[in-house]
């Protein structure tokens, strides 16, 4: 007997699951694993950007500035900002008609 043919059987009123009242440990374990898998899949799809960004970059927030004079901190911030500033000369402007 295959589990696939025994799970759902038609009755007069509606479809019923024969395993719903079963106390078989294998059925209980597979049900729990199935529910956990579904919950984890839903959470993964909802929060995949946050989760994978955390895995990729960790909790790093940049280098520590403890013990560094304020003038050097400001210089570092300006260097970082200038590194991210966009130079328009590197891009081609395309106008759509």
Swiss-Prot record:
The record marks 37 as: Essential for channel activity, possibly by being protonated during channel activation, and by forming the channel gate and the selective filter. GO terms for cellular component: host cell plasma membrane; membrane; virion membrane. The keyword Phosphoprotein applies. It is a single-pass type III membrane protein. Residues 1-22 are virion surface. GO terms for biological process: protein complex oligomerization; symbiont genome entry into host cell via pore formation in plasma membrane; symbiont-mediated suppression of host autophagy. The record marks 41 as: Seems to be involved in pH gating. It is found in: Virion membrane; Host apical cell membrane. Gene3D superfamilies: 6.10.250.1640. GO terms for molecular function: monoatomic ion channel activity; proton transmembrane transporter activity. A lipid is attached at residue 50 (S-palmitoyl cysteine). Residues 60-83 are annotated as: Disordered. It holds the Pfam family Flu_M2. The keyword Hydrolase does not apply. Keywords: Disulfide bond, Host cell membrane, Host membrane, Host-virus interaction, Hydrogen ion transport, Inhibition of host autophagy by virus, Ion channel, Ion transport, Lipoprotein, Membrane, Palmitate, Phosphoprotein, Signal-anchor, Transmembrane, Transmembrane helix, Transport, Viral ion channel, Virion. Its main location: virion. Residues 44-97 are intravirion. Cytoplasmic tail plays an important role in virion assembly and morphogenesis. When the channel is activated, one or more imidazole moieties of His-37 probably become bi-protonated. Belongs to the influenza viruses matrix protein M2 family. Forms a proton-selective ion channel that is necessary for the efficient release of the viral genome during virus entry. After attaching to the cell surface, the virion enters the cell by endocytosis. Acidification of the endosome triggers M2 ion channel activity. This is Matrix protein 2. It comes from Influenza A virus (strain A/Chicken/Hong Kong/715.5/2001 H5N1 genotype E). The gene is M.
